[in-house]
């Protein structure tokens, strides 16, 4: 079984990941042959984006199973899952994917074809992600008017998923439907996913895109230059509170103040029904060097103290709607999320 998209390639024996740290200047793949190499790729942001992380971890689980040599298989796979789980604490898709793989593993523990069954499940997950993103795109495109200028933050495109994207999937689907769309991509400090990745993706697709600094958004909204904000999500609480790349909350506040619709585009798997509100979402703190350095060059004084939370939480009152593959969820969010989840 094989899979090949922009973000990842499953060769049948290894997982090749597009090294997103080097984009847009170098297109280079990193080959992972063990679950620990996959964990390293997730932790070091060779691959990033909640849906992509989830599927990557699923293939890491497959590789972990193949590494088993002797002893208690269940205990070995528990350790494999733990190694992969420790990589990124905020993205719920990671845990969703690993729990799904573990369930299949335990249900087929005595099956002699267990390795093939696990590989099939990871492949199924990858294909589902592509189909899900296209459904999100179709549902979201209906909210985009012809001639709109859309502001997006970070990168929630094909690079953040198996293919097509969530927030950028909405934009792609609108363009495919014949609508004229212009995009403003926040540079998204400190990792510059907007400037490096979103701009790269949209330019390859021939979609008009402007890179703006993170602190321009409010002024552009005030001048009436932005018609909607569309972002992705790393975890959504049961009440609709949404964790996404740091800076998302600021955009939501600005959008509310300037009467600009603020949309979150994410698969149902990003909703965490075990978390009642955003107050319970763990926020990853990353290395100081990501803030003090840019492009390998120091840009801040030696020894300066740094805060580097990778995500923030936008409360549901600032969100116009959540776009999913099962439809568009509008307020009251908790009631409507429960309906769509069937809980």
Swiss-Prot record:
Record bears the keyword Glycosyltransferase: no
Family as reported in the entry's similarity comment: Belongs to the eIF-2B alpha/beta/delta subunits family. MtnA subfamily.
Site residues (Transition state stabilizer), renumbered to this chain: 154
Organism expressing this protein natively: Thermotoga neapolitana (strain ATCC 49049 / DSM 4359 / NBRC 107923 / NS-E)
Residues of the active site: 234
Reactions performed catalytically: 5-(methylsulfanyl)-alpha-D-ribose 1-phosphate = 5-(methylsulfanyl)-D-ribulose 1-phosphate
NCBIfam families, per database record: eIF-2B_rel, PRK05720.1, salvage_mtnA
UniProt: substrate binding residues: 48-50, 88, 193, 244-245
Gene3D superfamilies, A to Z: translation initiation factor eif-2b, domain 1 (1.20.120.420), Translation initiation factor eif-2b, domain 2 (3.40.50.10470)
Enzyme category, top tier: isomerase
Record-given protein name: Methylthioribose-1-phosphate isomerase
Taxonomic placement: Bacteria, Thermotogati, Thermotogota, Thermotogae, Thermotogales
GO BP annotations listed: L-methionine salvage from methylthioadenosine
Gene responsible for this protein: mtnA
One Pfam family, short name: IF-2B
């Amino acid at each position: 079984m094989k899979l090949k998209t922009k973000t990842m390639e499953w060769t049948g024996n290894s997982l090749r990941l597009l090294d997103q740290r080097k984009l847009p200047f170098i297109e280079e793949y990193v080959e992972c042959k063990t679950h620990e190499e996959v964990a390293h790729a997730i932790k070091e942001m060779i691959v990033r984006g909640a849906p992509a992380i989830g599927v990557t971890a699923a293939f890491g689980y497959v590789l972990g199973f193949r590494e088993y040599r002797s002893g208690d298989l269940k205990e070995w796979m528990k350790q494999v899952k733990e190694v992969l789980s420790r990589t990124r604490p905020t993205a719920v898709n990671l845990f969703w994917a690993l729990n799904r793989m573990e369930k299949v593993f335990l249900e087929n523990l005595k099956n002699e074809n267990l390795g093939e069954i696990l590989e099939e499940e990871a492949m199924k997950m990858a294909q589902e992600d592509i189909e899900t993103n296209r459904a999100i795109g179709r549902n979201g495109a209906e909210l985009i008017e012809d001639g709109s200028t859309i502001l997006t933050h970070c990168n929630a495109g094909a690079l953040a998923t198996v293919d097509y994207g969530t927030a950028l999937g909405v934009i792609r689907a609108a363009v495919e439907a014949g609508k004229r769309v212009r995009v403003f991509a926040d540079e998204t400090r400190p990792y510059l996913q907007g400037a490096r990745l979103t701009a790269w993706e949209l330019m390859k697709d021939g979609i008009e895109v402007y890179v703006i600094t993170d602190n321009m958004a409010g002024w552009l909204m005030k001048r009436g230059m932005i018609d909607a904000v569309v972002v992705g999500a790393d975890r959504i609480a049961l009440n609709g509170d949404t964790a996404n790349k740091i800076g998302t909350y600021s955009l939501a506040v600005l959008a509310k103040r300037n009467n600009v619709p603020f949309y979150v585009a994410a698969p149902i798997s990003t909703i965490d029904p075990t978390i009642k509100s955003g107050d319970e979402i763990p926020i990853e703190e990353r290395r100081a060097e990501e803030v003090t350095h840019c492009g390998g060059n120091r840009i801040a004084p030696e020894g300066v103290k740094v805060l580097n939370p990778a995500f923030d939480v936008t409360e549901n009152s600032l969100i116009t709607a959540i776009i999913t593959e099962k439809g568009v969820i509008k307020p009251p969010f908790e009631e409507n999320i429960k309906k769509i989840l069937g809980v």
